[in-house]
Amino acid sequence: MMTTLQNKEECGKGPKRIFAPPAQKSYSLLPCSPNSPKEETPGISSPETEARISLPKASLKKKEEKATMKNVPSREQEKKRKAQINKQAEKKEKEKSSLTNAEFEEIVQIVLQKSLQECLGMGSGLDFAETSCAQPVVSTQSDKEPGITASATDTDNANGEEVPHTQEISVSWEGEAAPEIRTSKLGQPDPAPSKKKSNRLTLSKRKKEAHEKVEKTQGGHEHRQEDRLKKTVQDHSQIRDQQKGEISGFGQCLVWVQCSFPNCGKWRRLCGNIDPSVLPDNWSCDQNTDVQYNRCDIPEETWTGLESDVAYASYIPGSIIWAKQYGYPWWPGMIESDPDLGEYFLFTSHLDSLPSKYHVTFFGETVSRAWIPVNMLKNFQELSLELSVMKKRRNDCSQKLGVALMMAQEAEQISIQERVNLFGFWSRFNGSNSNGERKDLQLSGLNSPGSCLEKKEKEEELEKEEGEKTDPILPIRKRVKIQTQKTKPRGLGGDAGTADGRGRTLQRKIMKRSLGRKSTAPPAPRMGRKEGQGNSDSDQPGPKKKFKAPQSKALAASFSEGKEVRTVPKNLGLSACKGACPSSAKEEPRHREPLTQEAGSVPLEDEASSDLDLEQLMEDVGRELGQSGELQHSNSDGEDFPVALFGK
């Protein structure tokens, strides 16, 4: 028993002593990976060492199995994530492959800016411009998959080696789409390549369709312009017809008439076919054609317009009137809108509500129009009687005026709207243009109804001259003629030469002033004899010599306001002169007009020298008149010969 126990103890102690050294323990624990080659210790063949070595291997296998069990769900999750990411990428590519409205508008604007020739000739430049507008589609899996990194858990790479990423660049075959740049790993299939190709084809087709649409829009714009021109040419007559109704002013206004009763005074709106110029002055509400507002007790019709839109006009387009221009007779016409301005009345200022001028189209053979002031217009019914009297006196223009009257009476029988359409400027102007009688005489003296007006002016002047010659009430014309005669003044005594010279200068000045001012003052130095009788001064009696000194002073004093200047006819004697002096005193103010400034320069000695005997002076004048035979023969036609007499 003792021997067996000792042997057991020795057997139990034996292996303990063998594995005691630390070098062997560290050596036995060295292999840590299953792939490393197994190293066997020489000389060790006991089962305990094999059991101990097998323990770490089992633990490592268990760990690997656990790791593989953990990696299985993670790989499935990664596959699901990849599938979702690929789907999202495909959706984004589809969205980006289809043009948005903003991109399409930008492309259309760029193409419209370029001309059609550049678009056809430079296709490459156009494609480049389009690709510059398109946004590049870039899909990188490294960016879209932030959770996936290169690791040893990849199914295709069991050894844990990383594979470098490669770039695949796919450009459309037409070069029209933007380049799509994406990164992928080796071994991964491209997601849905057929869909991408179809998307690229649809992109190119869409852009081609966009080009065609742009070209169609440009071509259609040109065709539209041509069609518009054709339509304007075709519808020109229709536009003119509309202008006759609208631009002529007929459709522009609403006519209101005020009741003449002072207790009423309401404004009533008239229908479109009523001419307000034909209405009487005592118009009242019961004369209104509108049944709803034909009594004074009915309230006034409401109107929502502004007061600034109201014009207190007496005529409307279509009113027949008589128009008068300066130097021409009254002529029948019709109120109508100006074809250039589109208005039929004008104001002197924008603050006025009463028109100052109306546009008139004259009746007659010639088509003429003009802007006539209000004070040169009359109603057609007012001047008919006066015109009949005028026709008796003037027969030269009766034919043309008769044609105009016939036309006015014909226009008076129809409504206002038809009147404007038939007798308006455009309709008559086109008719005269087709007949070769196109004469537009506006805003000038030539817009008179006929050429016979000049003859009328000449006849009026001749009639005036004849009336002035035959009419005894007009003595001014005679005096003007007397002033125009160049009669030489006569002097008195030895100073005849000096008086003659001074008289001539004064006569010229006075004549110029009297003609300029139309005054009838005769020249002062009318007393005396002609040059043929200037040498008979020595034969005159003594009292005439006393008048030598006062005569020179009286020449200046004769134009003063305090002196009287009277005209005496040559056939009258001394007694006739005395009787004619009071009657001619009424004409004294006319002779005071010229040279009124010289009145203050007359000295008082002139008044003293003028206190001579008037009777003696008149006797001397009678003797001179009796001796001058030549003067009687020259003035035998009966004209007055003025003699200046001076006195208080």
UniProtKB/Swiss-Prot annotation:
Residues 1-103, 137-237, 436-648 are annotated as: Disordered. Changing residue 303 to E: Silghtly reduced histone H3K4me3 and non-methylated histone H3K4 binding. GO terms for cellular component: chromosome; nucleus. Residues 317-383 form the PWWP domain. Residues 74-109 form a coiled coil. Keywords: Chromosome, Coiled coil, Differentiation, Metal-binding, Nucleus, Phosphoprotein, Spermatogenesis, Zinc, Zinc-finger. Testis. A zinc finger (CW-type) spans 250-304. It comes from the Eukaryota. Zn(2+) binds at residues 259, 264, 285, 296. Changing residue 303 to A: Reduced histone H3K4me3 binding but no effect on non-methylated histone H3K4 binding. GO terms for biological process: cell differentiation; homologous chromosome pairing at meiosis; meiosis I; positive regulation of DNA recombination; positive regulation of double-strand break repair; spermatogenesis. Changing residue 301 to R: Loss of histone H3K4me3 binding. The modification Phosphoserine is found at residue 636. Residues 194-208, 505-516 have a biased composition (Basic residues). One of its GO terms (molecular function) is methylated histone binding. Residues 61-79, 88-97, 209-237, 453-471, 585-595 have a biased composition (Basic and acidic residues). The CW-TYPE zinc finger mediates its binding to trimethylated histone H3K4me3. Dual histone methylation reader specific for PRDM9-catalyzed histone marks (H3K4me3 and H3K36me3). Facilitates the repair of PRDM9-induced meiotic double-strand breaks (DSBs). Essential for male fertility and spermatogenesis. Required for meiosis prophase I progression in male but not in female germ cells. This is Zinc finger CW-type PWWP domain protein 1. It comes from Homo sapiens (Human).
